[in-house]
């Protein structure tokens, strides 16, 4: 059974942040959830928390909430998609349909990262890894055909448009992870004067400082807030990092709080000269090529349907995997047995003959697999598999 449970940007950030899974805790959470299902992948971003499962049977949602220590009063806000609906949902997500910024491409890197983090836990996720790989393949073709790469949209470009319209030229970035890097990439070619960097130093951020030290520099948070006209907050901290006491009295300041959980304490929102825009409000100012993106995405939706069908075919064909493995094992045993009858050859030559026989046997098996695949698509897979058993295994 393939299914996903999740909560996304359609639920307000104040509630959504209660279920955000911090990156440093993801491996620990994956280990806990592996008690409930054979395969698990967590996709956790500022816009969504989704858990994908592949298991023999569906897991009770209450067990998941218990394992993650989540408040069960909010269970009704979560969606659950099963089998084909689950596949379709992931493909829509990675193609940008289910984003605050329609068509944005940051989700592609986030889906890749989710797949890689699941590998660190150990154990195999053959079905979910294949699902995510096909989703990424689908996204690549979809974005190319829909020409989304010609008109890219990111949270940085949306925020950058606001800053330009407001003539803001001194910006502070608090949090130097993936979002921080995204903004640095955007600002390196913009006409802002200063970009103050607050957070843990890393090699990628160092490159911006080295290439343009006049624009980019690491700075102390307190001094930064005195000088900056705008704060862009995107840390992965489980608590707020900007408080009322950090803001000088009467200071005019624009803050983009892009983190989930929030980086900015609620008291800051109430300061008279401070305007805070959170992650859920960003989509309201997304006007860059929006109609073009929506139109092109709708025109190319058939690409998603194609990949959904492709994955379902692969998933259904997996029922024959034991038969295929048994055929190959049986063929290898027969080849090794026949080699024993060869006389007057040394061990190296015997091994070479054995490899050649196994290779030839696999050519016939591969053809049998193709015939089985064709029969399965035509609805006669069971008849064909029984015939293959009689030919190859009896």
Curated annotation (Swiss-Prot):
- Amino-acid positions noted as binding NADP(+) in the UniProt annotation, renumbered to this chain: 175-180
The protein's superkingdom reads: Bacteria
Instruction: Check the record and name the NCBIfam families matching this protein.
Output: hemA
- Quaternary structure note: Homodimer.
Please give the function described in this protein's UniProt entry.
Catalyzes the NADPH-dependent reduction of glutamyl-tRNA(Glu) to glutamate 1-semialdehyde (GSA).
Domains as described in the record: Possesses an unusual extended V-shaped dimeric structure with each monomer consisting of three distinct domains arranged along a curved 'spinal' alpha-helix. The N-terminal catalytic domain specifically recognizes the glutamate moiety of the substrate. The second domain is the NADPH-binding domain, and the third C-terminal domain is responsible for dimerization.
More info? During catalysis, the active site Cys acts as a nucleophile attacking the alpha-carbonyl group of tRNA-bound glutamate with the formation of a thioester intermediate between enzyme and glutamate, and the concomitant release of tRNA(Glu). The thioester intermediate is finally reduced by direct hydride transfer from NADPH, to form the product GSA.
According to UniProt, the name of this protein is Glutamyl-tRNA reductase
Q: Which organism is it from?
A: Caldicellulosiruptor bescii (strain ATCC BAA-1888 / DSM 6725 / KCTC 15123 / Z-1320) (Anaerocellum thermophilum)
Which lineage ranks, top first, belong to the organism behind this chain?
Bacteria, Bacillati, Bacillota, Bacillota incertae sedis, Caldicellulosiruptorales
């Amino acid at each position: 059974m393939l299914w996903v449970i999740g909560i996304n940007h359609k639920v307000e950030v104040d509630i959504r942040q209660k279920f955000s899974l911090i990156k440093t805790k993801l491996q620990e959470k994956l280990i806990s959830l592996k008690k409930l299902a054979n395969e698990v992948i967590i996709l956790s971003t500022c816009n969504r928390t989704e858990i994908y499962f592949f298991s023999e049977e569906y897991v009770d949602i209450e067990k998941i909430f218990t394992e993650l220590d989540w408040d069960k009063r909010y269970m009704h806000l979560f969606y659950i998609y099963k089998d084909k609906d689950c596949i379709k949902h992931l493909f829509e997500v990675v193609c940008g349909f289910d984003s605050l910024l329609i068509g944005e491409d940051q989700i592609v890197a986030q889906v890749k990262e989710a797949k890689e983090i699941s590998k660190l836990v150990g154990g195999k996720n053959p079905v979910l890894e294949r699902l995510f790989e096909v989703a990424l393949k689908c996204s690549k073709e979809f974005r190319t055909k829909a020409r989304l790469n010609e008109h890219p949209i990111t949270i940085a470009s949306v925020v950058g448009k606001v800053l330009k319209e407001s003539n803001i030229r001194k910006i502070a970035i608090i949090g130097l992870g993936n979002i921080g890097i995204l903004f640095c990439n955007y600002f390196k070619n913009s006409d802002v004067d200063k970009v103050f960097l607050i957070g843990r130093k890393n090699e990628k951020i160092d490159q911006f400082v080295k290439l343009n030290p006049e624009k980019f520099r690491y700075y102390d948070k307190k001094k930064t807030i005195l000088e900056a006209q705008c704060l862009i907050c995107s840390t992965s901290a489980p608590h707020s990092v900007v408080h009322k006491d950090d803001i000088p009295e009467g200071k005019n300041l624009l803050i983009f709080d892009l983190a989930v959980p929030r980086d900015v304490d609620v008291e800051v929102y109430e300061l008279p000269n401070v305007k805070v825009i959170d992650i859920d409000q960003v989509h309201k100012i997304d006007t860059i090529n929006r109609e073009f993106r929506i139109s092109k995405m709708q025109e190319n939706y058939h690409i998603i349907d194609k990949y959904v069908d492709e994955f379902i075919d692969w998933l259904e064909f997996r029922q024959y995997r034991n038969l295929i493995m048994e055929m190959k094992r049986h063929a290898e045993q027969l080849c090794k047995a026949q080699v024993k009858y060869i006389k007057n050859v040394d061990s190296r030559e015997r091994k070479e003959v054995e490899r050649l026989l196994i290779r030839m046997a696999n050519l016939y098996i591969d053809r049998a697999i193709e015939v089985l695949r064709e029969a399965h698509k035509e609805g006669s897979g069971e008849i064909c598999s029984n015939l293959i058993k009689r030919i190859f295994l009896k």
